[in-house]
């Protein structure tokens, strides 16, 4: 599953949320799929929500209809109200900020390029991280670091994320997907 809006640093639009939601449904329903790899195009994992696109008016009407039909679709896409029954591996390059860090927390195995950066930048904009981080992050890393990230928008490097257990592997930049595929081969 590739988040593919590199010109927007893979910021999540309503259309992308629908597409990711549908990918999770396919993963669960297709017996030929044994696991998934979530990555981003163009050297960035995901920079969060595209706040301009979220205002509406720019998306395909069929996608907007689906968002209206399934009220928590965006939470399911971000793996907040959804837990795929098969393993999900994250292959992170570059930024995993805001919604990028939130969806990351719903994955099972996490690989990152050595210059990747993680963080919940919502507090810096006067926003609240609604994708589940207030619960999941403090369960996955030490409470004091989770609190600092949640309250201040502090960013952490790949090295620090590895030290605290937010990710499991660091590789040379440009090789996260390759490592994720190696892990997927062992699973499948």
Predicted regions and their residues:
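Glycine-rich beta-to-alpha active-site loop
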Residues: 77-125, 155
């Amino acid at each position: 599953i590739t988040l593919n809006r590199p010109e927007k640093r893979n910021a999540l639009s309503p259309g992308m949320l629908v597409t990711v939601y549908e990918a999770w449904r396919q993963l669960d329903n297709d017996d030929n799929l044994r696991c998934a790899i979530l990555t981003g195009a163009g050297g960035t994992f995901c920079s969060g929500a595209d706040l301009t696109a979220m205002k509406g008016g720019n998306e395909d009407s069929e996608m907007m209809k689906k968002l209206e039909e399934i009220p928590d679709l965006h939470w399911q896409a971000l793996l907040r109200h959804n837990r795929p029954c098969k393993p999900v591996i994250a292959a992170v390059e570059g930024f995993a900020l805001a919604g990028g860090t939130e969806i990351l927390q719903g994955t099972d195995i996490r690989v990152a390029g050595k210059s990747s950066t993680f963080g919940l930048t919502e507090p810096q904009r006067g926003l609240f991280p609604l994708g589940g981080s207030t619960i999941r992050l403090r369960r996955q890393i030490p409470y004091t670091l989770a609190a600092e990230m949640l309250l201040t928008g502090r960013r952490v490097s790949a090295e620090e994320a590895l030290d605290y257990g937010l990710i499991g592997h660091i590789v040379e930049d440009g090789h996260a997907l390759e490592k994720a595929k190696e892990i997927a081969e062992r699973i499948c």
